[in-house]
Amino acid sequence: MSPIALLSVSDKTGLIPLAKALVNDLGFKIISSGGTAKLIESENLPVTRVADYTGFPEILGGRVKTLNPKIHGGILARRDKQSHLDDLDKQNINPIDLVVVNLYPFVKTISKENVSWEEAIENIDIGGPTMIRAAAKNHQDVLVVTDPSQYSNLIDAYKSKKITTELRKKYSQQAFEHTATYDLTISNWIANQSSSKKVSWLQSLPLKQELRYGENPHQKASWYGEPEKGWSGANQLQGKELSTNNLLDLEAALSTLREFGYKNNISNPSYQKAAVVIKHTNPCGVAIGDSPSSALKRALDGDRVSAFGGIIAINCPVDEAAAKEIENIFIECVVAPYFDETAKEILSKKKNLRLLELKAESVQKADKNHIRSILGGLLIQDLDEPSIDQKKWKSVTELIPTDEEMNDLSFAWKIVKHIRSNAIAVASNQQSLGIGAGQMNRVGSAKLALEAAGTKSKGAVLASDGFFPFDDTVKMASDYGISSIIQPGGSIRDEDSIKACNELGIKMILTGKRHFLH
């Protein structure tokens, strides 16, 4: 008796070469339905339609096609159980040896703009997952394939007679993973369309890459991510394999950079061209410039010592001039929406430098949850998204910041939220001058930032991610010539800091919003 393959796929990639190999090279008979059967028939390949095999037509507009005992009995019957084989004989059911199924394109459907509830629901596959799960359960007798990328290996295994138990288990595991991911996607989408709160966190991400190691060589690490979303959508143009620390730094760089926009092109002359330099997930240089090269040079000038071995992110295409700024410094990675051919040629001389093109579309598609692990669980929060509402800011001192100072205060406020708390940023003329990060007291971070800025701090502005518990930071800022301060406010001693500002001739803005980063 010829082996039987059941083929029912939404993604028709590689279907015809597979069907030809099964029929012509391996002697399979094919059972199929709908568009899959129609495509196979168009190639003059023999195929039995499901409705003809079961004797039961498709009903409910195609909702019921393969949900039939002649299909599922053929898949689920164990060949080593005589009672199962007897049942097949009694019911005139043929055993099915291979199930090739992929599912209705639910993800593609819900990704469309303004997709209707009805259209999404109609793209929830029922028969497909049922066949996949049945075949995966009975993997000792039935091979199950769910992705076109598996077809070549499948045919090779048949031809070389290497259909091993291990291969069957591998395909079974991948099949259950496929249906689990599909169900999770549907569950999460329905939850997002309703007002009910999710009672459990469900997410399935495919393995993107096994990393060389974690933050340190003795730690194992893997990278999981949704295809085409966020960093999984980045195209590495050159350089060594990305490391765990590279990815953490790249994420910090992009988070900071998005405060200023992120676009594939800069046709709008008013678009802010920004560059960020990151070291150990903290910004050490941030600046806006008239061109990509100007922004990058100013960001590097913010702290060239710390920039050594860092990560660079630019929110617009990298051209020849920008590439030349990178050419003679040691940098681990550069990420931008685009690198022109001249820039790529210049930077190709730095063989170990990792260049990544990350399109704006991949950034926009990424999940807006911030997830961190704790012992035995996860903490999930909304991203601290780029947003500034100056209408809610309050000028609380006798002196009011000038327009130029307000621009710098806004710039510094965008930066400070991406510095590890306690965080202080000193800036002037849309350029960071000093960063104080991760100190256990706020005045300690202020000291680091002000000392880094040095004499450049005269007339500059200072931003703090949290309120001032005492007036000591104001007094230190005055010693360095700071003109204006921006901070959330909310301390029971706010008046002490405001009083100190008035006495020392410093302007102060309270935003009413805190930006801790742990």
From Swiss-Prot:
One of its GO terms (cellular component) is cytosol. GO terms for molecular function: IMP cyclohydrolase activity; phosphoribosylaminoimidazolecarboxamide formyltransferase activity. Its EC number is 2.1.2.3, 3.5.4.10. Residues 1-146 form the MGS-like domain. It catalyses: (6R)-10-formyltetrahydrofolate + 5-amino-1-(5-phospho-beta-D-ribosyl)imidazole-4-carboxamide = 5-formamido-1-(5-phospho-D-ribosyl)imidazole-4-carboxamide + (6S)-5,6,7,8-tetrahydrofolate; IMP + H2O = 5-formamido-1-(5-phospho-D-ribosyl)imidazole-4-carboxamide. One of its GO terms (biological process) is 'de novo' IMP biosynthetic process. The IMP cyclohydrolase activity resides in the N-terminal region. It comes from the Bacteria. PANTHER family: BIFUNCTIONAL PURINE BIOSYNTHESIS PROTEIN ATIC, BIFUNCTIONAL PURINE BIOSYNTHESIS PROTEIN PURH. Belongs to the PurH family. This is Bifunctional purine biosynthesis protein PurH. The keyword Hydrolase applies. SUPFAM superfamilies: Cytidine deaminase-like (SSF53927), Methylglyoxal synthase-like (SSF52335). Keywords: Hydrolase, Multifunctional enzyme, Purine biosynthesis, Transferase.
